[in-house]
Amino acid sequence: MVKPLHCLIGIVLFLAVLNAGNGFTLDRSASIERQEDSWPKISLFHGNQRKKRSEEKRFSDMEQTK
């Protein structure tokens, strides 16, 4: 018997895959801009981008203070 919780998890995963697929096209430069607009803020893509930007900013701040 399928439990309601399993059903809900399946639906959420399915929607997440559909949403992630919206940003991918053959044109790489256009797809990157579209991904940032269409992906939810909680996705790994945004988390990693934010982390990279903060590291780059910290590095540039260190360079300026030298």
From Swiss-Prot:
Disordered, as annotated region: 43-66
Biased composition (Basic and acidic residues): 53-66
GO molecular function, one term: toxin activity
Tissues expressed in: Expressed by the venom gland.
Domain of life: Eukaryota
UniProt KW keywords: Secreted, Signal, Toxin
Compartments (UniProt record): Secreted
One cellular component term from this protein's GO annotations in UniProt: extracellular region
Secretion signal, residue range per the UniProt entry: 1-23
Similarity comment: family membership: Belongs to the scoloptoxin-24 family.
Protein's name according to its UniProt entry: U-scoloptoxin(24)-Er2a
Native organism taxonomy: Eukaryota, Metazoa, Ecdysozoa, Arthropoda, Myriapoda
